[in-house]
């Protein structure tokens, strides 16, 4: 039996995935959570073979939660299931320790195939995303995102900023000092040739790393 943990801050999304999986022989939904912090805590006291993880959630988010789970619970495989498929997110997520990467537009059977593949010790990347990653290696000048220059930590902080989180919130959730968070911010601004959080959010929207509604809600 493959025990699966669903982690997404939208109950409707979790319900849809649960309906897909509950009729699949050999797969069981072992739990449902709405944030990355709770996923890490859950894994300390419960057993999941596979975690289906959303990227953008309140708190530390899917990228940081994936990194923590992959490093601490080596037998638990994480599949990122997200609307964000643009470079450099897939590569950064896989580097953080994810075993798979899927778009939320994936067909139900592909989700099942991904779960079975990572449980068997393989990596699974949706074909369209894998093609995009390959093209970015073959023709980097045409396909590389300006965000590709960011480190994993910088990318995580960027995603939190574009959700409207402030420096103090980010420092508390990532267990960093506000000074350290600001150092990451200014390093990002320098790499991206921008001057503030609003410009950062606009740039992230243009490159498909966050939704336009994010800016409107700030």
Where are these regions (language model features)?
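Recognition helix of helix-turn-helix DNA-binding domains
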Residues: 166-199
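Short, flexible helix-to-coil linker/hinge segments that flank and couple to helix-turn-helix
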Residues: 88-95, 100-152, 156, 206-212
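Acidic catalytic/metal-coordinating carboxylates
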Residues: 35-38, 60-64
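Active-site beta3 strand of CheY-like receiver
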Residues: 47-52
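Receiver (REC) domain active-site loop signature in two-component systems and cognate sites
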Residues: 57
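Helix-turn-helix DNA-binding segment
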Residues: 144-179
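Active-site residues of response regulator receiver
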Residues: 54, 82
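Basic, Lys/Arg-enriched C-terminal extension of HTH/homeodomain DNA-binding domains
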Residues: 189-218
